[in-house]
């Protein structure tokens, strides 16, 4: 929870009950309203070649009508039962299209009136975009044809979008696999009026276990029945002309994942029994492999209900987890299994092992690599090269390995070993590119791969691109940003031979825009031209300040002062300080600066920045580190350090 300090105490006294009953929603003062009631710049979705841009426009905030709609909280989900989609969705209300190097965007044609668009998904050939539109009665499936910029409705409002994206493209891009509401769906139970048939019974078997507190849990049999009704769908194949055909019968479908070549699909369904102490991601589930016409190939995995986990953040479930398709193969499943029983207290040389199984999935799984820490992912290259990462929360350690996925006898080589909170030592992430199956694999030129990093240093933030020689393991810096008057963020490498890189640039008063930066010629070319919607605070003073805690720990915060404030007079102002305590395992990491004074000033929901227009000083994102070195945990001295952090900022 964020901590808000203010020098003013607001007291409401002497208000009668009648006055409270007659109170209506109020508009904020003019200075704040001018920052709230603005047309914000769109978000951007690009194809893999970064040639086509879809501009997505949203309202800045939800309306009171949106916030007043019916909401059911079940099993970790928040659902609008009238429309069958998550009640937390932020909708898009308009779409425009732009070629990367064109200056002006074009309006998409054929969109519905009062559009409430969500669940966007590029087709495998990237010539179309699927999305949903939410009406007063439900969710429709739509597609956008990129060459013509024509949007078209495919279905009526019969989709079930209560769990995840309800539309999934077939590999040929000629049809969608859609979650539909069942024909004979049971009516929901009104839990406020329903009389229970019996008591709610939970069983304790005496097993020692640790569980966190979850929100929105199931509470009784009526909740169970409603959860099952709301999450049950039928799968139908819907062509681009709108023709529908049954694909799979009603079940609680949680995820659908086609193999890279589109021949197979892994279908995961929620099973019973449900739980009253954990959310749906810990409910039993079953993963079945189908072919692309809906015929069952094999049951790949059955996960039981997981209510009990070992103690610790690095505890894991037993059995197969993190199941997915290998990106560089047509149809190979990959997953991890804990070698320590999922218990971080067990001392073992390797925590996890990664396995693979190739279609038709009737052979024995093959172990391909083991990890010292807990497995966290693989970036695939080819038969001989892949990049593996693991992590261990207790020490904040991250390791990156290069390994040969075809030869498990060859020991993986560690190429990075660092504390992930030590941002000054972060080596960056390997750049990827889309392959023939539409999956992202290592971006390689000969023996070279490429890393892009945020570039935090003691002197500021300077993002970089490194060339990594896979044979020699040596790195060569190809580019490092030198801007001190603006912030540059590396988005993607477009063409390493030409030196073309897609970046974003911004400053305190310049909205983030995309540029093509030729790193060989050091010449950026602007490709989007989004305007600053918050010009009313252009003259506000913004400064990254540095100060020390009583024990000498370096701290930072972003200080905003009202426009026209004369610093030389040192006139006292009421101040709002906004902070979030963060845990660290060493003082070196805790003292590092991760803020950039050139970040665009973006007042969003819950931001204290609005109040600088009302004469307040605002200290935003003040450092509140809680350090526990060695065997000492941060929580051991949480309160004293919290007080010291606040005192340092105020003093």
Predicted regions and their residues:
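Sec-dependent N-terminal signal peptides
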Residues: 3-15
């Amino acid at each position: 929870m964020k901590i808000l300090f203010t020098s003013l105490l607001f007291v409401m006294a002497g208000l009668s009950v009648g006055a409270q009953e007659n109170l209506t929603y109020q508009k904020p003062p003019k200075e704040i309203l001018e920052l709230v009631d603005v047309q914000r710049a769109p978000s951007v979705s690009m194809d893999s070649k970064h040639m086509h841009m879809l501009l997505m426009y949203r309202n800045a905030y939800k309306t009171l009508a949106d916030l007043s709609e019916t909401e059911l909280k079940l099993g970790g989900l928040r659902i609008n039962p009238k429309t069958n989609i998550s009640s937390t969705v932020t909708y898009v209300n308009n779409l425009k299209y732009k070629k990367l190097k064109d200056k002006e965007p074009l309006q998409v044609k054929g969109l519905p009136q009062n559009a409430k668009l969500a669940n966007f998904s590029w087709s495998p050939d990237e010539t179309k975009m699927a999305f949903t539109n939410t009406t007063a009665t439900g969710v429709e499936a739509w597609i956008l044809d990129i060459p013509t910029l024509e949007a078209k409705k495919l279905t009526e409002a019969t989709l079930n979008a209560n769990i995840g994206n309800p539309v999934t493209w077939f590999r040929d891009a000629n049809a969608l696999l859609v979650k539909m509401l069942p024909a004979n769906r049971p009516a929901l139970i009104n839990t406020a009026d329903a009389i229970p048939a019996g008591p709610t019974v939970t069983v304790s078997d005496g097993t020692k276990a640790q569980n966190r507190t979850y929100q929105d849990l199931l509470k009784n049999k009526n909740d169970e029945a409603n959860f099952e009704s709301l999450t049950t769908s039928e799968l139908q194949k819907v062509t681009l002309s709108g023709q529908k055909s049954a694909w799979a019968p009603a079940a609680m479908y949680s995820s659908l994942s086609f193999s890279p070549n589109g021949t197979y699909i892994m279908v995961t369904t929620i099973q019973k029994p449900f739980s009253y102490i954990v959310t749906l991601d810990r409910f039993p589930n079953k993963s079945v492999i189908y072919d692309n016409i809906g015929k069952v190939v094999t049951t790949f995995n059955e996960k039981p209900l997981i209510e009990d986990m070992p103690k610790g953040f690095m505890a894991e479930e037993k059995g197969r987890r993190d199941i997915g398709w290998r990106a560089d193969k047509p149809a190979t499943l990959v997953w991890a299994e804990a070698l320590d029983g999922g218990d971080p207290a067990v001392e073992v040389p390797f925590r996890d092992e990664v396995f693979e199984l190739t279609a038709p999935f009737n052979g024995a799984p093959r172990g391909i690599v083991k990890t010292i820490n807990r497995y966290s992912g693989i970036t695939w290259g080819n038969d001989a090269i892949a990049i593996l990462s693991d992590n261990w929360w207790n020490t904040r350690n991250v390791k990156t390995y290069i390994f040969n996925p075809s030869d498990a006898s060859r020991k993986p080589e560690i190429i990075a070993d660092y504390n992930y909170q030590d941002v000054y030592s972060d080596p960056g992430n390997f750049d990827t590119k889309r392959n023939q199956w539409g999956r992202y694999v290592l971006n390689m030129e000969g023996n070279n791969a490429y890393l892009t990093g945020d570039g935090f240093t003691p002197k500021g933030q300077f993002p970089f691109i490194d060339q990594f020689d896979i044979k020699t393991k040596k790195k060569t810096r190809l580019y490092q940003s030198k801007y001190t008057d603006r912030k540059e963020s590396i988005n993607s490498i477009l063409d390493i031979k030409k030196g073309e890189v897609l970046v974003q640039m911004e400053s305190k008063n310049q909205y983030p825009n995309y540029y093509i930066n030729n790193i060989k010629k050091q010449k950026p070319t602007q490709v989007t031209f989004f305007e600053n919607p918050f010009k009313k605070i252009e003259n506000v003073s913004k400064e990254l300040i540095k100060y020390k805690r009583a024990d000498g720990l370096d701290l930072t915060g972003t200080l905003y002062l009202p426009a026209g404030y004369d610093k030389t007079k040192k006139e006292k102002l009421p101040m709002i300080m906004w902070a979030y305590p963060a845990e660290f395992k060493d003082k070196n990491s805790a003292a590092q600066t991760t803020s950039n004074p050139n970040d665009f000033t973006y007042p969003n929901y819950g931001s204290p920045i609005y109040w600088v227009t009302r004469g307040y000083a605002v200290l935003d994102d003040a450092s509140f580190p809680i350090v526990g070195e060695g065997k000492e945990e941060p929580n051991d001295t949480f309160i004293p350090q919290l007080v010291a952090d606040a005192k340092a900022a105020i003093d």
